[in-house]
Regions:
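Repetitive helical segments and hydrophobic/amphipathic motifs
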Residues: 11-12
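C-terminal motif of bacterial Sec signal peptides marking the signal peptidase cleavage site
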Residues: 15-16
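Sec-dependent signal peptide recognition
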Residues: 2-7
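Buried hydrophobic residues that stabilize the cores of well-folded domains
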Residues: 19-311
Length: 311
């Protein structure tokens, strides 16, 4: 459903978890996106997303996908249910077979579950906080554990994200592991359970740098922003209220106009550098109406497509 739910937003941000969950939230409909149209470099439609609003907030989303300008499949409908002004449930897919549920404590997201058409299980996310900042997100789902000996056993797969906040820096450590049905960690598996460390540098409500370190590689992303309104930021708290979404650069206060990507393997065998550039056209209120995407690699700049916003 993350693909279905406003995919161009990559879901939504909570800048200060809990603040946007107040029942007195006043949604300013004129600032929220009503329609998003994506086209490829040839001008052919790729995706059209429209929203239905009630009481100043979206209650449904219609998503249509295209190949060479021709729609593929039927329009997908997502329905959003609220408890007060907090998102409680999102249903989508055939016979609402895809579903997200959200649970809160003191206005903060404490747990969420997701069910997908392609999976026969439910994935659970659990959230912990210190001083109103998210410190741990634990993802879990049932799985078959494949042992190095060649055997298998039933168990649970976990991905744990731990966050340390220090001024304008956030450090995330991500680890994966598996437990048997008795809750004991299984070590002799064929799964890759390495540790990934991600360092975020923040400035003015935006992520300006992101460095990902693994055992084998380093990936650095550096972001440059405009000073205008980001429509993604304006959708705060309406869809997926996951507080970690504030660490996604394209969910920041302003719009990304340049992203420099640098991937280096620690063995020295490979290095990749390229640049994304976004050129914006704005309305009178300072919101983007058209965004043109370009990529640049080895000195060659290429137009990739456009995204159009209607408010």
């Amino acid at each position: 459903m993350k693909k279905i739910l406003f995919s161009f937003l990559a879901t939504v941000v909570l800048v200060s978890c809990g603040d946007k969950g107040d029942d007195n939230v006043d949604y300013q409909t004129n600032r929220l996106v009503k329609k998003v149209t994506s086209k490829n470099k040839n001008g052919n439609l790729e995706e059209v997303i429209t929203f239905t609003f009630q009481g100043g907030r979206p209650i449904s989303q219609h998503s249509s996908y295209y190949k060479d300008g021709v729609q593929t499949g039927t329009t997908q409908v997502t329905t959003i249910h609220y408890e007060g002004n907090l998102v409680k449930t999102e249903n989508a897919g055939r016979k609402n077979f895809e579903e997200n549920n959200y649970f809160y404590e003191n206005g903060k997201l404490s747990r969420s579950t997701e069910k997908r058409e392609r999976n026969d299980y439910t994935t659970t996310y659990e959230y912990s906080y210190t001083n109103n900042q998210v410190t741990t997100v634990l993802k879990s789902y049932p799985t078959t554990i494949y042992l190095k000996s060649g055997g298998t056993q039933s168990g649970t797969r976990y991905t744990e994200r731990q966050f340390t906040h220090n001024g304008n820096t956030v450090i995330e450590v991500k680890t994966g592991y598996e437990k048997d049905l008795n809750g004991v960690v299984v070590t002799n598996t064929v799964s890759s359970n390495g540790t990934q460390t991600i360092t975020y540098t923040l400035s003015g409500g935006n992520v300006v740098k992101k460095v990902e370190e693994t055992e084998y590689s380093t990936t650095t992303r550096e972001y440059t922003y405009d000073t205008k309104h980001n429509p993604r930021y304006e959708m705060i708290g309406i869809f997926n209220p996951d507080p970690t979404k504030t660490l996604e650069a394209y969910n920041g206060k302003n719009n990304v106009i340049k992203e420099k990507y640098n991937y280096t393997e620690k063995s020295g065998s490979r290095k990749i550098v390229f640049i994304y550039t976004n050129e914006h056209t704005y309305n009178a209120d300072g919101y983007p109406t058209i965004v043109k995407l370009y990529t640049e690699e080895n000195g060659t700049r290429e137009f990739r497509g456009t995204t159009e916003y209607e408010y």
